[in-house]
């Protein structure tokens, strides 16, 4: 598995990457043995029906923040995937960004306006990715309502490739991988692999493995069809009971804390996919910009963080295995 990664920095505010806490957290993430970092950060449009993406100089992550986080990774010989994202200020999931197909005059007015703004947004960060030597660029995340607009997306890809010369991917949602008709124009098939591999809390690693095998077999068919490797741009689950049945969940704070189920989710996935030649790798979701320090503090956390939890031991083991395999095959 080439990409043994983690996502860092999502939802951080201006200055967070440059802060001492941000540095400390990023270094702790490096220490688990990753060889790739996905640097994910959002800009915003006002509502899910807005056509303009805006930069807020009060809050949004700055170029200096991005350059700082990339440099730290490069100093540790860790490769970087830059992943600019768009969120909606009205708290609607970006998957619902959508517009009418045409107006009374037969014009695609809203889509043209939105893709014009989105392309300009992407090209700015594609230039940063190129100038800083980022090894991958992600052009979008879980934008299901836009994915049918194939002509527009192919133009986005063309424009990005004029600026950024490395491999690019797009991050669709789990179960939608075969619906993206323009994946052939990209280098990897990216997905948020929040597949439910349990029906309730208390599922074992072995039962999860059986579910992952079914998912693996389906993804292998798609990989072979498009002759593209599969990349889990996002995947993970919280340290909460029942998390493997709804890995995407971040809302149910009342759930009982459960490290074992989280660890089993990570272990089962790696066991099934790690050696597959058509599988490019994983960016686990996600590593907070400000992280706790001790196991005692970890016991109060029921989020996606794995720091000082059993899942962290799982990741270290498998990522070390990958490193040793690479060194042996050199």
Predicted feature descriptions by range:
Residues 9-16, 50-63, 104-117, 140-147, ...:
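The substrate-binding groove and active-site-proximal loops of carbohydrate-active enzymes
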Residues 35-51, 65-146, 287-290:
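Substrate-binding cleft and catalytic face of glycoside hydrolase catalytic domains
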Residues 62-63, 68, 76, 83, ...:
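Glycoside hydrolase catalytic-domain groove-lining segments
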Residues 121, 136, 146-170:
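Active-site neighborhood of glycoside hydrolase catalytic domains
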Residues 57-58, 89-112, 186, 250-251, ...:
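Aromatic- and acidic-residue-enriched segments that line the glycan-binding/catalytic groove
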Residues 16-17, 247, 263-268, 272, ...:
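Aromatic-rich peripheral "rim/lid" segments of glycoside hydrolase catalytic domains that contact
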Residues 14-31, 54-75, 120:
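Aromatic- and glycine-enriched glycan-recognition loops and surfaces
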Residues 15-30, 115-128, 173-182, 263-272:
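Short, acidic/polar
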């Amino acid at each position: 598995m080439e990409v043994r990664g983690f996502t860092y920095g999502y939802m951080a505010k201006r200055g967070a990457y440059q802060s001492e806490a941000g540095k400390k957290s990023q270094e702790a993430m490096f220490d688990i043995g990753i060889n790739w970092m996905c640097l994910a950060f959002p800009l915003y449009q006002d509502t899910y029906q807005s056509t303009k993406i805006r930069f807020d100089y009060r809050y949004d992550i700055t170029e200096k923040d991005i350059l700082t986080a990339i440099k730290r990774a490069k100093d540790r010989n860790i490769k970087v995937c830059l992943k600019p994202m768009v969120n909606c200020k009205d708290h609607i999931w970006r998957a619902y960004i959508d517009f009418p197909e045409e107006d009374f005059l037969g014009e695609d007015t809203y889509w043209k306006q939105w893709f014009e703004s989105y392309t300009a947004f992407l090209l700015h960060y594609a230039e940063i990715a190129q100038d800083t030597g980022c090894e991958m660029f992600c052009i979008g995340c879980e934008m299901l309502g836009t994915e049918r607009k194939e002509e527009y997306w192919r133009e986005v890809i063309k424009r990005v490739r004029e600026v950024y010369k490395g491999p690019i991917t797009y991050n669709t949602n789990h179960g939608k991988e075969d619906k993206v008709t323009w994946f052939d124009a990209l280098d990897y098939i990216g997905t948020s692999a929040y597949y439910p591999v349990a029906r309730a809390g208390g599922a074992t690693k072995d039962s999860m493995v059986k579910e992952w095998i079914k998912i693996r077999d389906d993804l292998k068919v798609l990989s072979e069809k498009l002759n593209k490797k599969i990349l889990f741009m996002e995947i993970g689950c919280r340290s909460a009971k029942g998390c493997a049945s709804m890995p995407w969940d971040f809302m149910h704070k009342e759930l009982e804390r459960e490290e074992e189920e989280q660890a089993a989710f990570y272990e089962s996935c790696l066991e099934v996919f790690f050696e597959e030649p058509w599988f490019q790798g994983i960016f686990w979701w996600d590593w907070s910009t400000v992280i706790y320090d001790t196991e005692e503090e970890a016991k109060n956390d029921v989020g996606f963080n794995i720091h000082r939890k059993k899942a962290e031991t799982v990741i270290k083991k498998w990522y070390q295995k990958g490193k040793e395999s690479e060194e042996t095959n050199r």
